[in-house]
Structures are given as C-alpha cells and as structure tokens.
Amino acid sequence: RRAVATTDPKTGCIYLSNELRGKFLTKVLLHELGHCAIFSFDLLDDIHRMVLPKYWFEAEEWVCNFIADYGESIFGVAYSILGEDAWALIPYELEKLIA
C-alpha cells in the first residue's frame, strides 16, 4: 500500500502526493495538519499516557482522522456563528497552531 501523504515530525513539513485532488485532498491535508498540531503542541506524550503502548499509533491516527472527518464541519459552524470574521480568525488560529 502506498502512502498519499506524510508529515515529518521534526520539521512539521507535510508531503502530499501530486495525485491528490478535491475532497480527498482536503481530507488528507486536514489529517496531516492534525499530525502537525500533535507535534507542535507536544501532545504525543498525552496520547501515550491515555492508551496502552500497543495502541499508540492507532490513537494518534484516530485523532488525525477525527480532525480530517469533522474539521470542515467544525470550521463551518465557526463560520455560521462568526460570519466573515471566521475567515480572518481561522487562518490566524491555524497559523498559531502549526507554527
């Protein structure tokens, strides 16, 4: 099986396949941004504290899949509440998140 994306935990650099398009690209990017958030906020130790070692990998992937599956909906709700201000706030908050 071939990976469509990966994130370097040391640099936070996301590598995406050139073949990704549309909704799948969005989902994969959100998933990888989840990894960036985990690395940036040093959350891996928190995940490791909460699950048995044999589930560490699966737990990290679950968190990133949650972000990929529900991130757009969450941002959509933010937009419905904040209106146009959401588009100013969300990129700023994302930048802080992965910086």
Residue positions per predicted region:
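Active-site scaffold of zinc-dependent metalloenzymes
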Residues: R1-L25, C36-D45, W56-E60, D69
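Compositionally biased, non-globular sequence tracts
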Residues: L25, Y55, Y92, L97-A99
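Walker B catalytic acidic pair
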Residues: E32
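Intrinsically disordered, low-complexity segments enriched in glycine/proline and serine/threonine
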Residues: H35, V63, K96-A99
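Post-HExxH zinc-binding segment in Zn-dependent metallohydrolases
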Residues: H48-Y92
